[in-house]
UniProtKB/Swiss-Prot annotation:
Gene that specifies this protein: Pex11b
KO phenotype (gene knockout): Mice have a marked decrease in peroxisome abundance. They share several phenotypes with Zellweger syndrome mouse models, including neuronal migration defects, hypotonia, a developmental delay, and neonatal lethality but no detectable defect in peroxisomal protein import and only mild defects in peroxisomal metabolic function.
Region (Interaction with PEX19, PEX11G and FIS1 and peroxisome targeting): 211-259
Source organism phylogeny: Eukaryota, Metazoa, Chordata, Craniata, Vertebrata
A Pfam family this chain is assigned to: PEX11
Subunit (UniProt): Homodimer. Heterodimer with PEX11G. Interacts with PEX19. Interacts with FIS1.
Species of the source: Mus musculus (Mouse)
Molecular functions (GO terms): protein homodimerization activity
The protein's name: Peroxisomal membrane protein 11B
């Protein structure tokens, strides 16, 4: 099992390079179509995109095993929320890869009777559930870091002798209960929360990259399942950005969100 996981990790970089090239072809094909390129050139780009997609499916054979191993490790996490989000995400990834393997068998001719449309819809559903769990985990970690940042700021203010009881609720000429002061206070609180969020993400690049990557990936299953039609241009752009961020985490392992 460990030997297979190591082999899968080695092929991961090639799969992500193919993924970046595939979505670059999708984006290029959309641009060529909008600018009235020749049908022959558009056909060649679509064929290249299809070959890259099939090649990625070949490289992902057996990734279900890797996802199940990751789920087994996540079960032992001490934080209940992280344990749930990460475990469920990996289990959905395992099911997604299993459906992807069936699709590869159908497209390669090994199982010509496979209903590819049905299995593609299943795979994108599992992919969507996995991304939802990933984003939930990101939101939870952001909340924890924002609470830590707020507590640290309060301690610094107490040490310096500045009172912070009430926080931003004490700001405003009309007080928290008066109509004249409520709207400016809400605007100030919202601005402070945005600044705090920006500070937290700036101080934790792995979390920032994970949020961006999952947010970009989310458009792909939403479009494929018909839940939110984005168009091939948006899907290609988001897929390309996500692929570049994934490659970046392979080149710089410290940018990978842990656990």
């Amino acid at each position: 099992m460990d030997a297979w996981v190591r082999f899968s990790a080695q092929s991961q970089a090639r799969e992500r390079l193919c993924r970046a090239a595939q979505y670059a072809c999708s984006l290029l094909g959309h641009a060529l179509q909008r600018h009235g390129a020749s049908p022959e050139l558009q056909k060649q780009i679509r064929q290249l995109e299809g070959h890259l997609s099939l090649g990625r499916k070949l490289l992902r054979l057996g990734n279900s095993t890797d996802a199940l191993e990751s789920a087994k490790r996540a079960v032992h996490l001490s934080d209940v929320v992280l344990r749930f989000c990460i475990t469920v995400s990996h289990l959905n990834r395992a099911l997604y890869f299993a459906c992807d393997n069936v699709l590869w068998a159908g497209k390669s001719g090994l199982a010509p009777r496979v209903d590819q449309e049905k299995w593609a819809q299943r795979s994108f559903r599992y992919y969507l559930f996995s991304l939802i769990m990933n984003l939930s985990r990101d939101a939870y970690e952001i909340r924890l870091l924002m609470e830590q940042e707020t507590s640290a700021y309060s301690r610094r203010m107490k040490v310096s002798g500045v009172g912070v009881s009430g926080g931003v609720e004490t700001v405003g000429p009309g007080g928290p209960g008066t109509p004249g002061g409520s709207l400016p206070q809400l605007a100030l609180k919202f601005r402070l929360r945005i600044l705090l969020l920006a500070r937290v993400l700036r101080g934790h690049p792995p979390l920032l990259l994970d949020v961006l990557r999952n947010a970009c990936d989310l458009f792909i299953p939403l479009d494929k399942l018909g839940l939110w039609r984005c168009g091939p241009g948006i899907v290609g752009l988001c897929g390309l950005i996500s692929s570049i961020l994934s490659i970046l985490t392979l080149i710089c392992p410290w940018l990978r969100l842990k656990p």
